Amino acid sequence: MKITLIAVGTKMPSWVTTGFEEYQRRFPKDMPFELIEIPAGKRGKNADIKRILEQEGKAMLAACGKGKVVTLDIPGKPWTTPQLAEQLEAWKNDGRDVCLLIGGPEGLSPECKAVAEQSWSLSPLTLPHPLVRVVVAESLYRAWSLTTNHPYHRE
């Protein structure tokens, strides 16, 4: 199973890239973790936000292909680390690749939300989207370590 994080936004600060890549490189070869960045639509004072969201959503879903779609969204389901580890096992047993979607400044398109089979909430807080990349990478690595009895996770 491959996990792909599909996120709106490019040109992240160096600390985001460093943090994400630190956890990305730790993933085992049988569970590659990939990042696909979708360029954000141009936003100005007269921007058509609905159209921008639609374009970003189409690009995200095209990048996902036939993978299982999981959105990262405040109204989603919050998971503890053990629950995320269970989700990881369920995703592996499903046999499909998994695509995790992080929207842009206005969130995810209605189409992305409609196609999603699951929605995961990291927090009831609104988090900066660059930070979400690092938190997701670490959380998934921690969940993987729990499923394999790797010493990274400690109760």
Swiss-Prot record:
Reaction equation(s) it catalyzes: pseudouridine(1915) in 23S rRNA + S-adenosyl-L-methionine = N(3)-methylpseudouridine(1915) in 23S rRNA + S-adenosyl-L-homocysteine + H(+)
GO molecular function: rRNA (pseudouridine-N3-)-methyltransferase activity
Annotated transmembrane regions: none
Domain of life: Bacteria
Chief localization: cytoplasm
Disulfide pattern: none
Entry keyword annotation includes rRNA processing: yes
Keyword entries, A-Z: Cytoplasm, Methyltransferase, rRNA processing, S-adenosyl-L-methionine, Transferase
Location relative to the cell: Cytoplasm
Cellular component terms per the entry's GO annotation: cytoplasm
Binding site for S-adenosyl-L-methionine: 72, 103, 122-127
Annotated function: Specifically methylates the pseudouridine at position 1915 (m3Psi1915) in 23S rRNA.
Subunit (UniProt): Homodimer.
HAMAP family assigned to the protein according to its UniProt record, in alphabetical order: 23SrRNA_methyltr_H
PANTHER family: METHYLTRANSFERASE, RIBOSOMAL RNA LARGE SUBUNIT METHYLTRANSFERASE H
Family: Belongs to the RNA methyltransferase RlmH family.
Identification of the protein by name: Ribosomal RNA large subunit methyltransferase H
Gene name as annotated: rlmH
